[in-house]
Curated annotation (Swiss-Prot):
Transmembrane segments: none annotated. It comes from Daboia siamensis (Eastern Russel's viper). Belongs to the peptidase S1 family. Snake venom subfamily. This is Alpha-fibrinogenase-like. Residues 25-249 form the Peptidase S1 domain. Expressed by the venom gland. Its main location: secreted. Residues 19-24 form a propeptide.
Length: 258
């Protein structure tokens, strides 16, 4: 019941956030209850919400711009109306960013690693997602998911996460649409050409999954969401795997790739 009351507050407060605050799955469909066991729902009492990805029993990967005070993290959650018996609530014990100042740009270092206050036990609805062994190829079919708005510019938040398939597209496509993106960045460009399918308000920090691995983190996109079929920008997880492994191993002074 507490979570349902929280959602009611989120529905009122979250809709007032600007597009830059957080990203949604537009043009998708309700996820199967068994396909998102690694998906984390993150929120606070102020109405800010994001997603994250469980990468082992005590660590969640998300976007740096999803950092918030008094962060609550739900794992094993599917429906706000019908909670799973094995869903768990955690808080952040520690947060790690690529820069000590927590600064990032739209095209670089939008990544946050969260250590939970205590590990979760894997169950029917809770399990981790693998980090990438190789970067994704252009043309790869990937999966996005989250509790973000399912329409734009009008914001409608669902009671269950929505999923959609999108493609990795050439980075040059995003450079043309989103000027002045640099010639190179540690991001991925992904969407569906000519169709309004993609991430939006409330999905920020969630995973871009290719071949069963987390290849991207929802970072930002157009306003309205997926405007005229525009692709969105995702943090390229493969470029940060060494940093992630180092932090988890206890080397908290590890530096991110330049």
């Amino acid at each position: 019941m507490v979570l349902i009351r929280v959602l009611a507050n989120l529905l009122v407060l979250q809709l007032s956030y600007a597009q830059k605050s957080s990203e949604l799955v537009v043009g998708g469909h309700p996820c199967n209850i068994y396909e998102h066991h690694f998906l984390a729902f993150m929120y606070n009492s102020s109405g800010f919400m994001c997603s994250g990805t469980l990468i082992n029993q005590q660590w969640v990967l998300s976007a740096a711009h999803c950092d918030m005070e008094n962060m609550h993290i739900y794992l094993g959650l599917h429906s706000f109306k019908l909670p799973n018996k094995d869903q768990k609530k955690r808080v952040a014990k520690e947060k790690f960013f690529c820069l000590s100042s927590k600064s990032y740009t739209k095209w670089d270092k939008d990544i946050m690693l969260i250590k939970l206050n205590k590990p979760v036990t894997y169950s029917t609805h809770i399990a981790s997602l693998s980090l990438p062994s190789n970067p994704p190829r252009v043309g790869s079919v990937c999966r996005i998911m989250g509790w973000g708005s399912i329409t734009s510019p009008k914001k409608i938040l669902p009671f269950v996460p929505h999923c959609a398939n999108i493609n990795i597209v050439p980075y040059t496509v995003c450079r043309v649409i989103y000027r002045p993106l640099p010639e190179q960045s540690r991001t991925l460009c992904a969407g569906v050409s000519g169709r309004r399918i993609g991430s939006c308000l409330g999905d920020s920090g969630g995973p871009l999954i290719c071949n069963g691995q987390i290849q991207g983190i929802v970072s930002w996109g157009s306003d309205p969401c997926v405007n005229r079929g525009a692709p969105s920008i995702y943090t390229k997880v493969f470029d940060y795997t060494d940093w992630i492994h180092s932090i988890i191993a206890g080397n908290t002074a590890a530096t991110c790739p330049s």
